C-alpha cells in the first residue's frame, strides 16, 4: 500500500503577535485573540516565498530519508501565492533538490487544499505504477489587506510529503473529496488581497465540507472518532478546527498535537499538512490518523492514515521538528512586518 515515505516542513522564524497588529488599528487585542484563538503568526522574510519555503520543506523531507531525488517522478506544489503567475514553482523545487529531467510537474490551485490535492494525485500515480516516488507540497505566504480581519491570521509556511510504496512510515488507507461552488473567499487575477463573503465562511463553507468529508471517510472505513489516535483539520483560525472536532465527537487529546494555528497562524495550503507533520513528529507505530483539509470555493480532502513500524527506524530529528521551529522565534513589530510583506510603497511605486 502506498503512503508517506518521508516528510518535512518549514516555518519562517519571524513572528508577530495580534496585540501588535491590534495596536496599530486601534482594536482590542483580547477580543481578537479570544475570537479567533491566535496568539501569534509567522511572517516570511523579504527573501522568502512559496518557492523557497517549498524547497526547504522538500530538503527537510530528504534529510529524514535518504532517497535518490532522481527516483522522484512527480512534483506538485499547491499554493494560492505562487511567486510567478507564469512559471511553475514545481520546476524550481525539482531543480533545487536534483530530480531527473523525466518528471511530471505542475503547480496546483484550490485555495487552501491545493497541497492535499497534490497528495491525492501523487498517491494515484504511485498506486498505478507510473512513478516510484512523488513529492506533494502545500505552501503559502498568504495575504491579508491592512486592517482586514485576515491580517491577524494570514501567515507563511509549508510541508512536503514524499509518497511511495517502499518503506512507508504512514500508510494512506483511503482518500476522498467533496466540492461545491461556494463563494466564501476569492481573489481575482491581479488583485493583491483576497475578499471574503463572511456569511458563507462558517457553516456553508468550512463546516459543511469538513464535517461531511470526515463523516464520509469514517463511514467508508467503518470507524468512529474513538478509533483514531489523532485528528487534524484545516486551520483558518484556532476556533474552527476545535469546533469541528467537537461536533464530530473527538476529544482534545486527539487534536491538540496537530493544532498549530494558535502559534503560527493560517499557512493556507500548508495548514492541514503541517498539522499532520506535527503529528508524525510524535506518533508511534499503529497510530490511526484522520486528516481533513479545506479549500475555499469550496472543497475538502479526507485521508485515513495508519502509522507503520518504520516510523521508529526514522531519525525524525535529522530535520527540524515542528516543536523546534515553534521555539525558533524572532519577534517583529508592525513596521517590520509591513516592510517584509511589502505593504509599504514609497516613491513612484518602488517597494
From Swiss-Prot:
CDD domains: init_cond_enzymes. One of its GO terms (molecular function) is hydroxymethylglutaryl-CoA synthase activity. One of its GO terms (biological process) is farnesyl diphosphate biosynthetic process, mevalonate pathway. Pathway: Metabolic intermediate biosynthesis; (R)-mevalonate biosynthesis; (R)-mevalonate from acetyl-CoA: step 2/3. Keywords: Acyltransferase, Isoprene biosynthesis, Transferase. Its EC number is 2.3.3.10. The active site is at 80 (proton donor/acceptor), 112 (acyl-thioester intermediate), 234 (proton donor/acceptor). Belongs to the thiolase-like superfamily. Archaeal HMG-CoA synthase family. Interacts with acetoacetyl-CoA thiolase that catalyzes the precedent step in the pathway and with a DUF35 protein. The acetoacetyl-CoA thiolase/HMG-CoA synthase complex channels the intermediate via a fused CoA-binding site, which allows for efficient coupling of the endergonic thiolase reaction with the exergonic HMGCS reaction. Catalyzes the condensation of acetyl-CoA with acetoacetyl-CoA to form 3-hydroxy-3-methylglutaryl-CoA (HMG-CoA). Functions in the mevalonate (MVA) pathway leading to isopentenyl diphosphate (IPP), a key precursor for the biosynthesis of isoprenoid compounds that are building blocks of archaeal membrane lipids. This is Hydroxymethylglutaryl-CoA synthase.
